[in-house]
Swiss-Prot record:
One of its GO terms (biological process) is DNA repair. Signal peptide: none annotated. Its EC number is 6.5.1.2. This is DNA ligase B. Transmembrane segments: none annotated. The active site is at K125. GO terms for molecular function: DNA ligase (NAD+) activity. Gene3D superfamilies: 5' to 3' exonuclease, C-terminal subdomain, DNA ligase/mRNA capping enzyme, Helix hairpin bin, Nucleic acid-binding proteins. The keyword S-adenosyl-L-methionine does not apply. The lineage of its organism: Bacteria, Pseudomonadati, Pseudomonadota, Gammaproteobacteria, Enterobacterales. It catalyses: NAD(+) + (deoxyribonucleotide)n-3'-hydroxyl + 5'-phospho-(deoxyribonucleotide)m = (deoxyribonucleotide)n+m + AMP + beta-nicotinamide D-nucleotide. It is an enzyme of class 6 (ligase).
């Protein structure tokens, strides 16, 4: 199906500012859109942390939060007020601050970060809720949510009810501060196949709700930091394992370079694990003294996250395509996103009716994933722009018997017919894609779908954008097409039959085909009464008759006398 180019309403133009894509909005609209998204994120954040309910998928929340920061930077707005997870209203001080972790974009960034650092280790980035565990005199004294990194909520009563978290410790751990991730225990979780499962929200919900002690049995703990613990990493891991924090030792590997990090990352992505992950964390064994830890200043560790299974993408335009059968399909053009190493710039929405039900306009944020064979798929609309400027769909008068001849209103269906006849299902014109057909039609103003047969080699060579080699190839392809069988030419004319049914009919000429009755067509494979009637309508169509006469004049096999 070809794009209805004239209907491409790209109301959002984009420019680059400090490497980020910025919407070219007037100041008033920019302020309004930012305020609306900021409020929505704040509402979701409040529900999430106060009620333990996730109103939106974790990944969507994270991506929209990043989008908000991007917009704020575009207009020079302070980003300090951006909603964060969790909220800043915890009152219990952390004995050691949570530093957070720097995110690395790709392997090149990992290589750069590792350069000059030694004694490096990699761990899975367990997806859950961060916590501080404080042990005093061999007993769990306090458990504090991450909060803003300096202070958080007192979770001690809940944490005491989680069987997997040791309530007593000995030796160096008898008086220790540990930081880790409370996670949802899984059996054989394969991240690549099963995804994130909204694990973070589920854990938060369990910790926030009251009277759910039995649900806490499904939670586990992964310790990723022991501030002021043993300087030797193997010793640190060994002591944690003896104390009951065995997962840390099992899933902490020494690495020397980015290749080893990548190998571990891929292995944990595709292997069965006891928890959900969203990447890996690389850390130095040598850490500063705990008194120097500050939020946002943990330069001794970094994360390399997995690419999200679905990406939030901004709709830049709504376009309409008309297929050879006349069916109108709506396509959303996107500000490009990367999914599984694939650059996604458009997604098929479906029919006009479906588009209207989705209520998608330029400026909206939609969630896009890859379906079978890497085809982009629209999953949901996650944020709607305040302005709802939508294009008007083309008239719906197109059908399977329209646009064999070119006209202003037939532009897109006509191009679709050219693309079809050049495909391997019809004449097999190698090298003739949509762009080539558009160039030829725009230059030489085809009258009908077979007008290209009358082009000379000089005309093809003079088509803008056609190099000498390409024009010669097209000239050869057009000449070879003249030798194609009658059946293939009929397929190129879009007879409403399968190729198998057409072969079974035994027709080898237009004259034979005209003599066939509806009863004859009904007896062919996969051809019932309805399709047989469509064949008769196709055969009797004035444009089809005119094309058959033109092909006869061109001495195409099966059409001449």
């Amino acid at each position: 199906m070809r794009l209805w180019k004239s209907m491409a309403w790209g109301i959002l133009l984009w420019h680059s500012q400090s490497g980020a894509l910025c919407p070219a909005w007037p100041p008033a609209r920019a302020a309004e859109e930012i305020a609306r998204l900021q409020q929505q994120l704040a509402d979701w954040n409040d529900i999430y942390w106060k009620q333990g309910v996730s109103a939106v998928d974790d990944s969507v929340y994270d991506q929209l939060s990043a989008r908000l920061v991007q917009w704020q930077r575009c207009v020079g707005q302070d980003v300090s007020s951006t909603p964060v997870s969790p909220p800043l209203n915890g009152t219990t001080m952390h004995p050691v601050a949570h530093t957070g972790v720097r995110k690395l974009a790709d392997r090149q960034a990992v290589e750069q970060w590792m350069r000059g650092r030694s004694e490096l280790w990699v761990q899975p980035k367990v997806d859950g809720v961060a916590v501080t565990l404080v042990y005093q005199n061999g007993k769990l004294a306090r458990a504090i949510s991450r909060g803003n990194g300096l202070q958080g909520e007192d979770w001690t009563p809940k944490i005491r009810l989680i069987p997997s978290i040791p309530q007593t410790t000995q030796g160096a751990l008898a008086n220790a501060v540990l930081q880790g991730e409370i996670f949802l225990q899984r059996e054989g979780h394969i991240q690549q196949r099963m995804g994130g499962m909204n694990a973070r929200s589920k854990v938060a919900g369990m910790l926030m709700r009251q009277d759910n002690a039995s649900a806490l049995n499904s939670l586990g703990i992964f310790i990723w930091a022991w501030p002021d613990g043993p300087a030797n990493m193997p010793e640190r891991l060994s002591q944690l394992a003896k104390a009951g924090f065995s997962l840390t030792k099992k899933y902490t590997l020494a690495v020397k370079d980015a290749s080893e990090v990548e190998r571990a990352r891929q292995s944990w992505l595709t292997s069965a694990l006891p928890f959900v992950t969203d990447g890996v964390v690389i850390r130095m064994a040598k850490e500063p003294a705990a008194q120097y830890w500050r939020p946002g200043q943990g330069d001794w560790l970094a994360a390399w996250k997995y690419p999200p299974v679905a990406q939030v993408a901004q709709v830049s335009a709504i376009q309409f395509s008309v297929g050879k059968s006349g069916k109108i399909t709506v396509v959303a053009s996107l500000v490009p996103v990367i999914l599984d190493d694939k650059r996604v710039q458009r997604v098929n929405i479906g029919s006009v009716k479906r588009w209207e039900a989705w209520d998608i306009a330029p400026g909206d944020q939609i969630l896009v994933s890859l379906a079978g064979q890497g085809i982009p798929r629209l999953d949901e609309v996650v944020w709607r722009s305040r302005e709802r400027s939508k294009p008007v769909p083309p008239d719906s008068h197109f059908n399977s018997l329209t646009c064999f001849y070119a006209s202003a209103t037939c532009q897109e269906q006509f191009i679709s017919r050219l693309v079809w006849l050049g495909s391997r299902s019809a004449l097999g014109l190698d090298g003739m894609g949509e762009a080539s057909w558009r160039a030829l039609h725009q230059t030489h103003r085809f009258e009908h779908i077979f007008s290209w047969l009358a082009l000379t080699s000089a005309q093809i060579a003079n088509t803008p954008g056609f190099a000498k080699g390409k024009s010669e190839q097209i000239w050869r392809q057009f000449n070879l097409a003249r030798r194609q069988s009658f059946t293939r030419w009929i397929m190129a004319m879009d007879i409403p039959l399968t190729q198998a049914a057409l072969q079974a009919s035994g027709d080898r000429s237009w004259e034979q085909l005209l003599m066939r009755t509806e009863q004859h067509w009904r007896q062919l494979p996969a051809t019932g009464e309805r399709r047989a009637g469509r064949v008769i309508d196709w055969r009797d169509n004035p444009q089809i008759k005119a094309l058959s006469r033109w092909l006869s004049a061109q001495h195409i096999p099966g059409f001449g006398s």
